[in-house]
């Protein structure tokens, strides 16, 4: 039977079968995990192949250089180079790594200055971080969040009384150049010395000398002990300036997710948007309003949504039960620079709509010597009110009202020659409150300091003090209370409570101060 089957298959059929098999064989090469660089320009590379690349995946080049895939096209991939792209050439190989960008996280980064990839740039040796985490992460969902009800003291009387910031809030600092935006952010970090809040300062597109000055000031005040500085200077590639805020956010989230509180400052997001616009245009993405790409809103919303107050359940789940009954928070103070006070430009309006309030700093106020140059009329905190300490909440109502009435009356007073007694008193009180809100840089006020100042103003103890002497009077009053009423000040700082006994103690303290001092 077997022999007869062999006889039926003649040699010509065998050769035809073999030819058919050879013809059907697919010999075309498909580049899956390796590709070839076909174009290099301005920190952007176009790679032919890499069919398996993911969006945001790390791409490895020859010489240990890495890139990040941002454009996935039919037969090529557009990537930004994370580092010096001048060593790359057309024809070189590029490989998928299967990993997304990660940066080191943990307490080891406190006191250090790092770049957008978490590499130390302060000359203090390597960072021995035990953990790394993804730069791009999804923000906690609604179910895991908790309402903001604890304060972040910025140390500024004008902010803590009228525009309070809570833990887990996003409060925008917006203003023209040279209006004190960075100074306010640095003071907010210095004010956290005794609060236990860890800080991250992200410098985007700034001069290296400016960043060095900030670091020096933080070291002088002892604030560097609980602060990490992430620096993407003006001379760094656009890709680094684009990534720096996300890297800093991941470093801050390490503390939030473990039931601690953190504060992050993005200085400033206008420059990040410009860097992202540059990358997008080089990647040939279609431009939109002001030449920004269509997803510039998403650029900032996905970053700022990661700042949140998370519930104890979230922390417990994240730490696998290691931390219980602790909520965590990441508070964001993004900074936006406006051009000639134009807050209706594209990026400012985007960030205003994403954040929970804004602090407007004005050039005219700054030049008039009112520093911090906060415009209390259009500055607002949408959630901070519920986070204020009891004593500040109780006392600060009069400040906002006095300033609002003063602004309204000051406009009328320009045209009216004779003013009645009540109006004149309101104007004078408004002038004194405006003067009281002035504050020197690097001199944060504690809760107790603010309470004493505001109480003295509200109850008319400054009515007989000359306007130009208000600042000196206030400084002397605080100094007197710190030396003569130290236990009371300590109690207010620790509890934030306000009752009849505390009010009586503050009142008698101010009266005894006024009896000994003449202003």
From Swiss-Prot:
GO terms for cellular component: plasma membrane; proton-transporting ATP synthase complex. The keyword Cytoplasm does not apply. It is a peripheral membrane protein. It catalyses: ATP + H2O + 4 H(+)(in) = ADP + phosphate + 5 H(+)(out). It is an enzyme of class 7 (translocase). Gene3D superfamilies: 2.40.30.20, ATP synthase alpha/beta chain, C-terminal domain, P-loop containing nucleotide triphosphate hydrolases. The record marks 379 as: Required for activity. It comes from the Bacteria. ATP binds at residues 175-182. Keywords: ATP synthesis, ATP-binding, Cell inner membrane, Cell membrane, CF(1), Hydrogen ion transport, Ion transport, Membrane, Nucleotide-binding, Translocase, Transport. GO terms for molecular function: ADP binding; ATP binding; proton-transporting ATP synthase activity, rotational mechanism. Transmembrane segments: none annotated. CDD domains: ATP-synt_F1_alpha_C, ATP-synt_F1_alpha_N, F1-ATPase_alpha_CD. The keyword Phosphoprotein does not apply. Its main location: membrane. It is found in: Cell inner membrane. SUPFAM superfamilies: C-terminal domain of alpha and beta subunits of F1 ATP synthase (SSF47917), N-terminal domain of alpha and beta subunits of F1 ATP synthase (SSF50615), P-loop containing nucleoside triphosphate hydrolases (SSF52540). Belongs to the ATPase alpha/beta chains family. Produces ATP from ADP in the presence of a proton gradient across the membrane. The alpha chain is a regulatory subunit. F-type ATPases have 2 components, CF(1) - the catalytic core - and CF(0) - the membrane proton channel. CF(1) has five subunits: alpha(3), beta(3), gamma(1), delta(1), epsilon(1). CF(0) has three main subunits: a(1), b(2) and c(9-12). The alpha and beta chains form an alternating ring which encloses part of the gamma chain. CF(1) is attached to CF(0) by a central stalk formed by the gamma and epsilon chains, while a peripheral stalk is formed by the delta and b chains. PANTHER family: ATP SYNTHASE SUBUNIT ALPHA, MITOCHONDRIAL. This is ATP synthase subunit alpha. It comes from Acinetobacter baylyi (strain ATCC 33305 / BD413 / ADP1).
């Amino acid at each position: 039977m077997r022999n007869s089957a062999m006889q039926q298959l003649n040699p010509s059929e065998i050769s035809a079968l073999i030819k058919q098999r050879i013809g059907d064989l697919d010999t075309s090469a498909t580049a899956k995990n390796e590709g070839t660089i076909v174009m290099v320009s301005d920190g952007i590379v176009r790679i032919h192949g890499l069919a398996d690349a993911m969006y945001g995946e790390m791409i490895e080049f020859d010489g240990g250089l890495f890139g990040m895939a941002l454009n996935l096209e039919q037969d090529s991939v557009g990537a930004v180079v994370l580092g010096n792209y001048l060593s790359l050439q057309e024809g070189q190989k590029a490989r998928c790594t299967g990993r997304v960008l990660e940066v080191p996280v943990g307490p080891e980064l406190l006191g250090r200055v790092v770049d957008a990839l978490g590499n130390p740039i302060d000359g203090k040796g390597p960072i021995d971080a035990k953990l790394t985490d993804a730069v791009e992460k999804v923000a906690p969902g609604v179910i895991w969040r908790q309402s903001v009800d604890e304060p972040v003291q910025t140390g500024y009387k004008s902010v803590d009384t009228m525009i309070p910031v809570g833990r887990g809030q996003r409060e925008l600092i917006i203003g023209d150049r040279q209006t004190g935006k960075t100074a306010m952010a640095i003071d907010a970090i210095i004010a956290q010395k005794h609060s236990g809040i860890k800080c991250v300062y992200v410098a985007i597109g700034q001069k290296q000398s400016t960043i060095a000055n900030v670091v020096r000031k933080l070291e002088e005040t002892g604030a560097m002990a609980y602060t990490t500085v992430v620096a993407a200077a003006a001379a760094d590639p656009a890709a680094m300036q684009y990534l720096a805020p996300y890297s800093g956010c991941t470093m801050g989230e390490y503390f939030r997710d473990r039931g601690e509180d953190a504060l992050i400052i993005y200085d400033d997001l206008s420059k990040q948007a410009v860097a992202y616009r540059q990358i997008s245009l080089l990647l040939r993405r279609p431009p939109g309003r002001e030449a920004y790409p269509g997803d510039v809103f998403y650029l900032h919303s996905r970053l700022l949504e990661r700042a949140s107050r998370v519930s104890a359940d979230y922390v417990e789940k994240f730490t696998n039960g290691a931390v219980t009954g602790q909520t965590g928070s990441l508070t964001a103070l993004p900074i936006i620079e406006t051009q000639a006070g134009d807050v209706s430009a594209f990026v400012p309006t985007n960030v205003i709509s994403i954040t929970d309030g804004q602090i407007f700093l004005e050039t005219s106020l700054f030049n008039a010597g009112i520093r911090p140059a906060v415009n209390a009329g259009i500055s607002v905190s949408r959630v901070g009110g519920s986070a204020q300490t009891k004593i500040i909440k109780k006392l600060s109502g009069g400040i906002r009202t006095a300033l609002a009435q003063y602004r309204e009356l000051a406009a009328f007073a320009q045209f009216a020659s004779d003013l009645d007694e009540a109006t004149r008193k309101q104007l004078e009180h408004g002038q004194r409150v405006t003067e009281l809100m002035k504050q020197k840089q690097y001199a944060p006020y504690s809760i107790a300091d603010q309470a004493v100042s505001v109480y003295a103003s509200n109850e008319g103890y400054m009515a007989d003090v000359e306007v130009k002497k208000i600042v000196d009077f206030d400084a002397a009053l605080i100094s007197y209370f710190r030396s003569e009423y130290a236990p009371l000040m300590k109690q207010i700082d620790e509890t934030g409570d306000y009752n009849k006994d505390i009010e009586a103690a503050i009142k008698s303290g101010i009266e005894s101060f006024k009896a000994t001092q003449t202003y």
